[in-house]
């Protein structure tokens, strides 16, 4: 069983986040009571991971944990075996006492594209919607964020996050909650909200943008990253059934159309700050994620298209302000 008591105590002392306590404990109790087949096995492995503050932590330039006195070879092999229990590792990379967790995604590349365009995170409270295993939350703390709260309903992502946190010495500035955005009340409590790689999974994208706005304080900043297509402000792709073998994907606007959508729901100062075609070096199969990946989802004869014939994945980053 997971104990979220530390997070409850934390938000009880924050006047903006206190109202969350009206619903959050029951939501997390309901989550605990819902069974997941692999969860007991993962939890058993998590409990075996050593806890203790490492001598060196770098979350500014990477996510790297090390000791001045290296682990013995036997200890390293045991730790690597435990971490591999949590396969597949999709978001990263991490370097843990010399063990390089080579994840499917080079999430550090995305962070390098995002960081130059956002307001400094120093002393800000941050919400990361669809945070995966929390890689970007560690990087946000590396930029001086006061508090990072991530939400993602995946059991495995929570376990991976807690494994890294345990190896970091139990840092309480970052917390991952196994929830979806639709379960959050209108908190208006965060200085910065990130939604990266989520919008195209939402049946109602405008509602998602409103939900994000509802979490921001007045004057707060939204960083939105999603799959887009090329085109003017009227261009939107609605894939039939699958896109790059993904199910449950719905709306792929152009970056210019997405800017209009953000303005439509009340955001100001909307900027398109980056547009980038995803390369097969950024998303690929590794020995920490051995399933199919982007190279398998592109047309072998024309990599500018997916196997379904749609334009290959193109991602945009937009930054906007809540009035």
Curated annotation (Swiss-Prot):
Binding site for carboxy-S-adenosyl-L-methionine: 91, 105, 110, 130, 152-154, 181-182, 196, 200, 315
InterPro entries: CmoB (IPR010017), Mo5U34_MeTrfas-like (IPR027555), SAM-dependent_MTases_sf (IPR029063)
CDD domains recorded: AdoMet_MTases
Gene Ontology biological process terms in this record: tRNA wobble uridine modification
Molecular function as annotated in GO: methyltransferase activity; transferase activity, transferring alkyl or aryl (other than methyl) groups
Keywords from the named record: Transferase, tRNA processing
UniProt keyword tRNA processing, yes or no: yes
EC numbers for this chain: 2.5.1.-
Catalytic reaction list: carboxy-S-adenosyl-L-methionine + 5-hydroxyuridine(34) in tRNA = 5-carboxymethoxyuridine(34) in tRNA + S-adenosyl-L-homocysteine + H(+)
Protein family membership: Belongs to the class I-like SAM-binding methyltransferase superfamily. CmoB family.
Complex and partners: Homotetramer.
Purpose: Catalyzes carboxymethyl transfer from carboxy-S-adenosyl-L-methionine (Cx-SAM) to 5-hydroxyuridine (ho5U) to form 5-carboxymethoxyuridine (cmo5U) at position 34 in tRNAs.
Protein name per Swiss-Prot or TrEMBL: tRNA U34 carboxymethyltransferase
Organism whose genome encodes this protein: Vibrio vulnificus (strain CMCP6)
């Amino acid at each position: 069983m997971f104990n979220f008591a530390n997070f409850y105590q934390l938000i009880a002392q924050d006047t903006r986040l206190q109202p969350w306590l009206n619903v959050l404990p029951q939501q997390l109790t309901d989550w605990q009571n819902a069974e997941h087949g692999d969860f007991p096995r993962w939890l058993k492995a998590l409990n075996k991971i050593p806890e203790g503050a490492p001598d060196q932590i770098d979350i500014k330039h990477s996510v790297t944990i090390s000791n001045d006195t290296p682990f013995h070879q036997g200890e390293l092999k045991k730790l690597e075996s435990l971490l591999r229990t949590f396969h597949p590792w999709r978001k990263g990379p991490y370097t843990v006492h010399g063990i390089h967790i080579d994840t499917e995604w080079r999430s550090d590349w995305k962070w390098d594209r995002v960081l130059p365009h956002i307001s400094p995170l120093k002393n800000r409270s941050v919400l990361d919607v669809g945070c995966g295993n929390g890689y970007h939350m560690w990087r946000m703390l590396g930029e001086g964020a006061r508090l990072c709260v991530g939400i993602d309903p995946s059991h495995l992502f929570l376990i991976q996050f807690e494994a890294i946190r345990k190896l970091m010495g139990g840092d309480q500035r970052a917390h991952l909650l196994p929830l979806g955005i639709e379960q959050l009340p209108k908190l208006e409590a965060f200085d910065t909200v990130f939604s990266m790689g989520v919008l195209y999974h939402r049946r109602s994208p405008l509602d998602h943008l409103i939900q994000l706005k509802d979490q921001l304080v007045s004057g707060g900043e939204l960083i939105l990253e999603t799959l887009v297509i090329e085109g003017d402000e009227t261009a939107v792709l609605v894939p039939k059934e699958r896109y790059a073998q993904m199910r449950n994907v719905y709306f792929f606007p152009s970056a210019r159309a997405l800017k209009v959508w953000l303005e439509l729901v009340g955001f100001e100062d909307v900027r398109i700050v980056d547009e980038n075609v995803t390369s097969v070096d950024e998303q690929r199969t590794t020995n920490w994620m051995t399933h199919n990946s982007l190279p398998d989802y592109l047309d072998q004869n024309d990599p500018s298209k997916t196997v379904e014939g749609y334009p290959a994945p193109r991602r945009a980053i937009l930054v906007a302000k809540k009035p």
